[in-house]
């Protein structure tokens, strides 16, 4: 069941009496509680099992994929047979709290260059400080070679909170890489550090000449946007080529944003969320000069993983956004017309645990990772 909404209108779902949906200045606002029932007729098939806290996946040529496990393992898996092979020679990883081995991206020209990209929390000293890190490497057989550190966020800090992170390559070959604010919320408003930012780099790690802060020095040269909290979803729009990002709010205020060069996305100056246990954060949800979210969830759903659907298996979903939820253990479809939100659908809930990542294969198959000790990869099939 999909709830359609109109601009400046208010409509309440009959099945969800606590789900008002309204627009204000073109912004979609949600307050909801999800019961335990299915909204879409789909089946879930586990294709790979016995993965420990899988965090991200990307597709290799053929029927294989790479999957990260947060404790620090990278697996090559066969999506048809379920066979797993652990990749060797990984860098040192700080697997503490929310940190560990995080995102993986396979280069679009992998057949020619065997290149992949990994994001993870890396230790920086013996005292336990760590920072969000991006590397490239070549996958030769079942081991990594030619590893190059492309970026490390500054400063490195103790603790295990809010590392981010996702990485995607835009159509022009630029890398976009999200960095959490490590729980130092005020630092996200200071682009002189990397906390709470999205980084933009050439694939060799060099700073593009058109990065927004390269010449004016109002921020670090690597930064593309700032004012983010903990972005754990990133996707490339298949038509516009723009990068979409979602991030965790505090108690409420999870957001989806479309990135803009040099933009301030507000955290913690503006947010629809509040302190855990109650209490205001910042000056409110809006302020001049700060980008408003395309969509936000209040209360939070704890979004993680995101991809645009393109394919023939679910033809009615083409151009829509699929988002995982850790808190409500569900998959959400955001119905889009271009870049305008029309409504949402709960595809399923409470069937595989916490949904950590969502990926759509080149063939239009939808794969999901569950953030569980005995996790795995699941394929979504129509009934």
Predicted regions: what they are:
Residues 342-362:
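Conserved blade-ending motifs and adjacent loop-strand segments that build the rim/top face
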Residues 20-36:
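Bacterial N-terminal signal peptides
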Residues 132-141, 192-203, 259-260:
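Beta-propeller blade signature
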Residues 219-258:
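Repeat-solenoid scaffold signature
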Residues 39-43, 81-86, 139-148, 206-219, ...:
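Beta-strand initiation motifs
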Residues 38-185, 233-236, 241-249, 299-337, ...:
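Acidic, Gly/Ser/Thr-rich repeat motifs that build Ca2+-stabilized beta-propeller blades
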Residues 87-99, 147-160, 203-224, 268-297:
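Surface-exposed loop and turn segments in beta-propeller and other repeat-based domains
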């Amino acid at each position: 069941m999909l709830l359609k909404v109109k601009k400046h209108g208010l409509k309440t779902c009959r099945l969800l009496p606590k789900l008002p949906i309204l627009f204000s200045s073109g912004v979609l606002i949600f307050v909801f509680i999800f019961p335990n029932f299915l909204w879409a007729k789909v089946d879930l098939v586990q294709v790979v099992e016995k993965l420990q806290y899988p965090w991200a996946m990307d597709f290799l040529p053929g029927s294989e994929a790479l999957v990260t496990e947060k404790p620090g393992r990278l697996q090559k898996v066969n999506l048809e047979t379920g066979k797993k092979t652990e990749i060797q020679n990984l860098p040192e990883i700080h697997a503490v709290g929310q940190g560990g081995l995080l995102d993986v991206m396979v280069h679009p020209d992998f057949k020619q260059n065997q290149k992949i990209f990994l994001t993870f929390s890396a230790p920086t000293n013996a005292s336990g400080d760590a920072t969000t890190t991006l590397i490239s490497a070549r996958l030769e057989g079942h081991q990594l070679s030619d590893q190059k550190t492309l970026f490390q966020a500054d400063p490195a800090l103790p603790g295990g909170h809010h590392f981010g992170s996702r990485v995607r390559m835009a159509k022009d070959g630029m890398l976009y890489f999200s960095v959490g604010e490590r729980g130092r919320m005020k630092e996200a408003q200071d682009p002189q550090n990397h906390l709470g930012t999205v980084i933009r780099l050439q694939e060799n790690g060099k700073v593009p000449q058109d990065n927004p802060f390269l010449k004016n020095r109002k921020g670090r040269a690597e930064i593309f946007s700032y004012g983010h909290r903990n972005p754990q979803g990133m996707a490339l729009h298949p038509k516009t080529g723009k990068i979409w990002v979602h991030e965790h709010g505090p108690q409420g205020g999870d957001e989806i944003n479309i990135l803009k060069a040099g933009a301030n996305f507000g955290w913690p100056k503006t947010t629809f969320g509040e302190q855990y246990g109650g209490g205001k954060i910042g000056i409110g949800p809006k302020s001049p000069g700060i980008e408003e979210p395309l969509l936000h969830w209040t209360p939070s759903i704890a979004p993680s993983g995101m991809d645009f659907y393109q394919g023939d298996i679910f033809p009615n979903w083409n151009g829509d956004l699929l988002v995982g939820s850790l808190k409500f253990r569900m998959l959400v479809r955001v119905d889009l017309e271009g870049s305008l939100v029309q409504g949402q659908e709960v595809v399923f809930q409470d069937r595989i645990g916490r949904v950590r990542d969502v990926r759509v294969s080149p063939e239009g198959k939808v794969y999901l990772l569950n953030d569980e000790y005995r996790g795995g990869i699941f394929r979504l099939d129509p009934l």
